[in-house]
Amino acid sequence: MSLFNKVTKSFQWGDKTVVMETGEIARQASGAVVVDIDGTVILATVVASKTAKPGQDFFPLTVDYIEKTYAAGKIPGSFFKREAKPSEHETLTSRLIDRPIRPLFPEGFLNEVHVVIHTLSLNPEVDADIAAMIGVSAALSISGIPFSGPIGAARVGYINGQYVLNPGQTARKDSQMDLVVAGTEAAVLMVESEAQQLSEEIMLGGVVFGHEQANIAINAIHELVRDAGKPVWDWQAPAEDEAFVAKVKSLAEEKLRAVYQIRSKQARTQALREANASVMNTLKESGEPFDAGKVNDLLFAIESKIVRSQILSGEPRIDGRDTRTVRPIEIRNSVLPRTHGSALFTRGETQGLVVTTLGTERDAQRIDALAGEYEDRFLFHYNMPPFATGEVGRMGSTKRREIGHGRLAKRALVAVLPTKEEFPYTIRVVSEITESNGSSSMASVCGGCLSMMDAGVPMKAHVAGIAMGLIKEDNRFAVLTDILGDEDHLGDMDFKVAGTTNGITALQMDIKIQGITKEIMQVALAQAKEARMHILGKMQEAMGEAKTEVSQFAPRLTTLKINPEKIRDVIGKGGAVIRGLQEETGTTINIDEDGTITIASTDPEKAEFAKKRIEQITAEVEIGKVYEGPVTKILDFGALINLLPGKDGLLHISQIAHERVEKVTDYLSEGQIVKVKVLETDEKGRVKLSMKALTERPAGMEYSERPPREDRGDRGDRGGERRERSDRGDRGGDRGERAPRFNSEQQQQPRSNEQQPAPVGEQPYAPRDSQE
């Protein structure tokens, strides 16, 4: 009998077969599922604590997506040869999984939950993130942990006017959209997308298509739960003390209503702290014991109800705006004097100082991803220090939120970047959030676009971003334009859209409730477009087009194309030539395999000098052309003349002068600069030169030249086959003491009479006796 009670379910999903298994691996986890999609295999596990920690006032859910290099048949390239801290891709995938499952845990469930996903095998054409989302959904569903799932997920492409389910990395090169959607059977919960300036209708169609396809996976998970599901936990939300709730409400409601009439964030935040502290003090004075965490939850619920009811009844929002108004915008370009490009973008109480730096191809980020190595020439980094929200905090390593916001801004801008051929720079954009009250990632998009244009990046269009919110109660709903931080926390949807006047380039949705219909999303997209056009107008007023020249402090890139066969001449043995060029010219030189050479320098004259030197190195000698160069070597039969860097030609003794030349050194010396004419080149590339072709023959001089003494390096056919040593006859007699061999480094001495060759037919030496 087997140790395992394995349950397997498979289903056809587009052109792929999906297999889900449980009961064999990781049996001590609360739930564990292995998902295999055409060779991409993931293990999803979930473990939950049976009880919440005392005083716990938030839901402690942690999602860790981990890629193992053995999944792609690789060994880690680090010094320790093992997987280290999470890569950016792993962090983003962890967030992608977290976002749709978090709202499905019940209110009041504060037990610690840890979700871990391992990628065990990877087919580069099947993304592991979708398999991971399905695996996590299945693991949670069979675990018995309180969870209102399952969820399904799908990736959607848009190729040749058609939606494509789960396109691989090859197919995505032709896709105008890369969209991931996740949700339950009834509702979409999460959307993450980038696109090539597509319309709102096409984007919404992609969301609907993806949701329909995700339901196929949900149905299969239901079948797995029926056969392998564990008993559902007997968990109930803590019963509310109605009398205590009423007491807190009576103490706090009027104070909180007054707080939310204050329009300034800082003043409102301070008043809110004072109101909450007043309630706490009153409760303490009453002598009745209470849980401070529970009181804070009740106060937040009262705040939420006040703000939501005001908005749904048509009253002004927290800062006094109506639902469609964008906060005041101010833009300043070229803020920093010595950076390559900069912009200060302020929208209400949200502000980003965004800086662009231009670099060479060597500055591109080389990423050793599981699916294969690639080079990233566009980097976007987002930072938000604690002072941006008026708080005290620690400055440490980059947080998951910062990585996610930077990735969203990058998605929004990448569609309008110039090609490498149009603009061969590596671009790094850094958004420093100096104030935050909602939608700082979209401020980063706007500031990033303006900063790059200030740096001289020829953007195809301006890109603006806007964050939308939603308040929904029963059949009433209100879509909010340009949400504040408080509206984000108190609302039901965070909906970010970025794009140009032509269409959407990035879309991100996080929905906290079920029941968001297609019609509501249509209204939200239409309202977002209206706001986007308003912001684009402000940006175009501030900076109509990109600067035509890059900053004087940025490297100037000069490109030229050479014959790929000449690349080795430019690099030289062991890189000696290119290193020497860079040291000589003070430039940075990069060579592509196709022969494209990029020269980077902040000094245009140095770049031009380097270009000329490369042209000299790679130039071909032209027949009939006159060159001037130094004598590099004197030979018995002529001299070698340097014509171009690394290219010498032979000036034969017969081509030095019209008169007979007995000794080359009578006319030439090493280092002497002479003018020569190219007579011809042979099939091996050897060049023959002439000095006398540049002068006229003196009148009356007879034509009597020595026959040419050619270089005997290639002696050609010597008349018949050479005999083997064993066929050379009897060499006769005692050879005596053998003369020392000729040393090629010593000067060769003329032969003595005794060393003259023997007459033909005679053998001067006998073969050595083998018994000597």
UniProtKB/Swiss-Prot annotation:
GO terms for biological process: mRNA catabolic process; RNA processing. Keywords: Cytoplasm, Magnesium, Metal-binding, Nucleotidyltransferase, RNA-binding, Transferase. InterPro entries: ExoRNase_PH_dom1 (IPR001247), ExoRNase_PH_dom2 (IPR015847), ExoRNase_PH_dom2_sf (IPR036345), KH_dom (IPR004087), KH_dom_type_1 (IPR004088), KH_dom_type_1_sf (IPR036612), NA-bd_OB-fold (IPR012340), PNPase (IPR012162). Its EC number is 2.7.7.8. GO terms for molecular function: 3'-5'-RNA exonuclease activity; magnesium ion binding; polyribonucleotide nucleotidyltransferase activity; RNA binding. It catalyses: RNA(n+1) + phosphate = RNA(n) + a ribonucleoside 5'-diphosphate. The keyword Aminoacyl-tRNA synthetase does not apply. Involved in mRNA degradation. Catalyzes the phosphorolysis of single-stranded polyribonucleotides processively in the 3'- to 5'-direction. This is Polyribonucleotide nucleotidyltransferase. It comes from Variovorax paradoxus (strain S110).
